[in-house]
Amino acid sequence: MSARHDDSDLTWLPTREGEEPWTIDDLEEVRSELLSERERLTADLAESEMDLQDLMRDYGGGSGDDSADTGGKVLEREQEMTLTNNSRGLLAQTERALERLDAHTYGVCENCEQPVGKLRLQAFPRATLCVSCKQKQERR
């Protein structure tokens, strides 16, 4: 676990042209949101993994089930796997954002090293790319 820096000096937090500088309240609001999200995702992930284990245990190869029942169970299992993987990804992104806050690299685009933007981060605290780089990524 990395040591936290002094958060009273926020000069390390970049902003885009025309944006107000970060305040301690802004930073604490983002940190609080990320911590709450981490807690929620951790609980969701634990529940999803238990549900998935139950589905795997209940799926006995379909003996005695007709093909519609078997297909329904397979679909349900695949949906639960998708939800579980999505939760894992969101949790990893949330952890990464918290690490970047502690390392004082939060708010810097991981691609072009320009500011991600205060407004973007307040709307989507897990963002690691500025809007321009995110759009380029999505076009690929």
What do the PLM-derived regions correspond to, one by one?
Residues 111-112, 132:
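Short, cysteine/histidine-rich loop/knuckle motifs that typically chelate Zn2+
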Residues 127-135:
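Cysteine-rich micro-motifs
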Residues 123, 138-139:
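Topology signature of small-to-medium multi-pass alpha-helical membrane proteins
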